[in-house]
Curated annotation (Swiss-Prot):
This is Ribosomal RNA large subunit methyltransferase E. Pfam families: FtsJ (PF01728). SUPFAM superfamilies: S-adenosyl-L-methionine-dependent methyltransferases (SSF53335). S-adenosyl-L-methionine binds at G63, W65, D83, D99, D124. It catalyses: uridine(2552) in 23S rRNA + S-adenosyl-L-methionine = 2'-O-methyluridine(2552) in 23S rRNA + S-adenosyl-L-homocysteine + H(+). Signal peptide: none annotated. CDD domains: AdoMet_MTases. It comes from Erwinia tasmaniensis (strain DSM 17950 / CFBP 7177 / CIP 109463 / NCPPB 4357 / Et1/99).
Length: 209
């Protein structure tokens, strides 16, 4: 019975995916993923990216966000990206493949950042979903906490943090923690996010000293 349910669910997801207007637009425009459109909508409203910025992209593969950011920060900007999965090269993006949860990978990522203070840390990280919120939400929140810890290490005063969060246990506490560190915090649900998904994006600007 479980297998049948999973098969039906997978088939439904595939049908939704390939008929999704953002997926179709991404394919037509030669974009890495539909995530490009999520970030574009956030940028139109919140103006996170400017020419010359240094940006850290966590959970970067297949590269939709990095691909978008390089169009905003220009040739003098820099994107440092990391993902456990491989990612095809993008001009202007320094990509590190590895598990961000591992100490050696985090150390290598921090070495690539160097002494430069980062203007934006963004995380589109998500665990492998089981479909069980009691399992998926804690795993997701753990990744969100790691992304916030990265902010503490590298984000410049006045910098911004963008993170994907799945609403559930721990969400309000995490939101309070972010509000204690940034002057302005908003919750966004871009049109390109699937309506039935629990995902939202926290946009935090003005990192406090």
């Amino acid at each position: 019975m479980t297998g049948k349910k999973r098969s039906a669910s997978s088939s439904r997801w595939l049908q939704e995916h390939f008929s999704d207007k953002y997926v179709l637009q991404a394919q037509k425009k030669g974009l890495r993923s539909r995530a490009w459109f999520k970030l574009d909508e956030i940028q139109q409203g919140d103006k996170l990216f400017k020419p010359g910025m240094t940006v850290v992209d966590l959970g970067a593969a297949p590269g939709g966000w990095s691909q978008y950011v390089v169009t905003q920060i220009g040739s003098k900007g820099r994107v440092i990206a990391c993902d456990i999965l491989p990612m095809d090269p993008i001009v202007g993006v320094d990509f590190l493949q590895g598990d961000f949860r591992e100490e050696l990978v985090l150390k290598a990522l921090l070495e690539r950042v160097g002494e430069t203070k980062v203007q934006v840390v963004m995380s589109d990280m998500a665990p492998n979903m089981t479909g069980t919120p009691a399992v998926d939400i804690p795993r997701s929140m753990y990744l969100c906490e790691l992304a916030l810890a990265m902010c503490r290490d590298v984000l410049a005063p006045g910098g911004s943090f963008l993170v994907k969060v799945f609403q559930g246990d721990g969400f309000e506490e995490y939101l309070r923690e972010i509000r204690s560190l940034f002057t302005k915090v908003k919750i966004r649900k871009p049109d390109a996010s699937r309506s039935r998904s629990r995902e939202v994006y926290i946009v935090a600007t003005g990192r406090k000293l």
